[in-house]
């Protein structure tokens, strides 16, 4: 058997992982500005954590979950999304306690797992960055979180992003709308796709979100959730819209947007951009005020979003956005002869301990091959160290871009390379 990675997974090699590290680091910096702190949860959870919160009738639970019984006969699932595990952690660790500052703001990043057809930007193991805010029902929390997502997408370079906005109202409004939707769709049941015929019985709102052509035709004249909002739900949505307008954030009301998870209420949103004629969702989320109580905690408001890293990187690539990744070496030491081997090891270590990104040759190659490696590494400065340099204690340091050279002692390099680095036109941080 030829050993290969499983279908729907990928190896993220060094050239690509640099982009991943940049995106993750960039997200951390943005989230810190909004006072979010990182939380890390297990990649597997008890099956009920996901099935009960995400919804027993959702595609995630019925079709896409990786679940199994472990050796202790416990029903386990690999996490398919990030919110339910974070809510479980919030409740289990009693972060709702009075002494914990509210609202509680968390972000997470890591792998998720769904058994679905692999395609560009959507794999069976995919990576998600997300945030969750607990303890505030203020519409300003909805807006601040949406604006944070917009801030991240704009600063990282995503172009042509449009904010799609909707509300699912409170449970009473949602129940009234659900019944109206059933009444509307039932006479059209035979025209719906097989999946939507099933959804009509279990979760009719999901029919609105279907990508099947026959379903899109069926819901063209469906009733709007906006006509079923009670006073509380209408006031919340109006406040969100007004605050977005106050901040100069454009949005599109999309009454057919429902999101794929059952726990949402009130505000839901997606950031969508067009790639090669197709609309791609790059970030999505909303409010989920009942989820903490569902996990056994007190009634606690919640709001959050998630975005897929693979899809984000795909969009950046398609839009021609080059991430500002610094891969250059500060110093490369070309080593000539066995007599310079030990000194080269001492020197490269001294440079690293001073904070420089440094490398040396280990393969006893000809100088031409070593200089080629220095160019491949986009090296800023080049040192050639042979037995004669070791004996004299003097060496030439070359700017590998301008070819300017300075003669210095090995002792100076070991103790204060910053001075030489700057003399050759480079600056230390």
Curated annotation (Swiss-Prot):
Which terms does the UniProt entry file under GO BP? histidyl-tRNA aminoacylation
UniProt-listed SUPFAM superfamilies: Class II aaRS ABD-related, Class II aaRS and biotin synthetases
Q: What is its EC number?
A: 6.1.1.21
| Entry annotated with the keyword Secreted | no
Q: Tell me which family the UniProt entry assigns to this protein.
A: Belongs to the class-II aminoacyl-tRNA synthetase family.
Q: Subunit info?
A: Homodimer.
Q: Which HAMAP family match?
A: His_tRNA_synth
Q: What is this protein called?
A: Histidine--tRNA ligase
């Amino acid at each position: 058997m030829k050993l290969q990675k499983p279908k729907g997974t990928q190896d993220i090699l060094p050239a690509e992982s640099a982009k991943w590290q940049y995106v993750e680091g960039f997200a951390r910096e943005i989230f810190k500005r909004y006072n979010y702190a990182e939380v890390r949860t297990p990649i597997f959870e008890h099956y009920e954590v996901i099935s009960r919160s995400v919804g027993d009738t959702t595609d995630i639970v019925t079709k896409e979950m990786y679940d199994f019984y472990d050796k202790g006969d416990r029903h386990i699932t690999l996490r398919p999304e990030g919110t339910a595990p974070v809510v479980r952690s919030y409740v289990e660790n009693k972060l709702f306690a009075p002494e914990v500052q509210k609202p509680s703001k968390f972000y997470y990043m890591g792998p998720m797992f769904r058994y679905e057809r692999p395609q560009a930007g959507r794999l069976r193991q995919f990576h998600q960055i997300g945030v969750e805010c607990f303890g505030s029902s203020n519409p300003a929390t909805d807006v601040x979180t949406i604006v944070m997502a917009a801030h991240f997408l704009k600063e990282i370079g995503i172009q042509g992003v449009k904010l799609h906005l909707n509300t699912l109202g409170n449970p009473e409004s949602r129940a009234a709308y659900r019944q109206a939707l059933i009444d509307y769709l039932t006479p059209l049941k035979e025209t719906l796709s097989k999946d939507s015929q099933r959804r009509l019985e279990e979760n009719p709102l999901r029919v609105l979100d279907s990508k099947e052509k026959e379903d899109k035709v069926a819901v063209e004249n469906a009733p709007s959730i906006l006509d079923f909002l009670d006073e509380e739900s209408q006031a919340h949505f109006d406040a969100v819209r007004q605050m977005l307008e106050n901040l100069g954030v454009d949005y599109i009301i999309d009454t057919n947007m429902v999101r794929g998870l059952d726990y949402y209420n009130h505000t839901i949103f997606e950031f969508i951009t067009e790639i090669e004629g197709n609309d791609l969702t790059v970030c999505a989320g909303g409010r989920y005020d009942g989820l903490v109580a569902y996990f056994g905690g007190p009634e606690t408001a919640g709001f959050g979003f998630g975005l897929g890293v693979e899809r984000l990187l795909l969009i950046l690539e398609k839009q021609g956005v080059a991430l500002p990744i610094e891969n250059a070496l500060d110093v490369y030491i070309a080593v000539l002869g066995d007599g310079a081997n030990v000194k080269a090891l001492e020197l490269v270590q001294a440079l690293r301990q001073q904070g420089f990104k440094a490398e040396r040759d280990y393969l006893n190659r000809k100088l031409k091959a070593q200089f080629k490696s220095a160019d491949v590494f986009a090296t800023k400065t080049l040192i050639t160290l042979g037995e004669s340099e070791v004996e004299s204690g003097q060496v030439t340091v070359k700017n590998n871009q301008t070819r300017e050279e300075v003669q210095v002692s090995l002792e100076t390099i070991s103790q204060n390379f910053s001075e030489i680095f700057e003399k050759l036109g480079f600056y230390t941080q």
